[in-house]
Amino acid sequence: MEHVTACYWQKETVPNIFLSLQQRKYRRRKASVVYACISDNRELLMNLQNKIEEELQGRDIWKSYTEERIREKWSKQLEAVDKNSNYAGVLCVDSRVLLFDHGGMNLCGFFKRFGRTGWKVWKDQCMVGEVEAGTAILLTDHGFLNYCEEELAGCLRPESVGTDLLSDRAERAERRLAELGRKAEQRGGRHMGAVWILPVKGEAIWSKGKQSNETVQTE
């Protein structure tokens, strides 16, 4: 399973939102991987990113561990984070996904269940499961969601994304997030950012045997 990704953050003289997005192809494991984190604390964001890197470099627990065991492991790690912190993260390994959020950062999107796709917003969750092609995952701060939830839901609806090349879909999603960011800013939104991930089936983003890495982070 491949992934279309896009991100947005409000450019500020003194950054208050930090994002990280990486997309890779592991030839040996034959796995497509995407992970992203968002926080208003740069040190915490780097800490979460390092924990995910450790997960990817260790034994392939994503195939040998049960979903409940992975969830318990990550819940324990997140319990050590300051209770007043704001963060959200996602790790997609093919169709398997880890999702977590806390405080002023939100986890939301379109999730397929029982043949139906609906918009959901979670708070303070740590979940592990399988995602189907067309599931749309969004990590965003509360302000962006508060000012533009209806518009975000509309542009991220799977059928609104199109069926053309994955790179074109990603570019279009990037532009749309930027448009909504400007709209939220005009409405008074501050310190905003979002990462969007759409697992899809179909053509590969990378040519055969090639690995791709992308990192997007405010400075």
Question: Model-flagged regions — what are they?
Answer:
Residues 2, 33, 91-94:
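N-terminal nucleophile
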Residues 2-15, 72-81, 103-132, 174-185:
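PP2C/PPM family metal-dependent serine/threonine protein phosphatase catalytic domain
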Residues 2-9, 132-133, 145-219:
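C-terminal catalytic subdomain
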Residues 8-9, 22-44, 101, 130-155, ...:
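Conserved beta-strand-loop-short alpha-helix elements that form
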Residues 14-70:
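Primarily the active-site beta-strand->alpha-helix module of PP2C/PPM metal-dependent phosphatases
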Residues 15-28, 83-89, 94, 115-150:
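Acidic loop->beta-strand submotif enriched in PP2C/PPM serine/threonine phosphatases
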Residues 31-33, 96-98, 106-107, 115-116, ...:
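Hydrophobic residues embedded in beta-strands of well-ordered beta-sheets
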Residues 56-110, 181-199:
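Catalytic core of PPM/PP2C metal-dependent serine/threonine phosphatase domains
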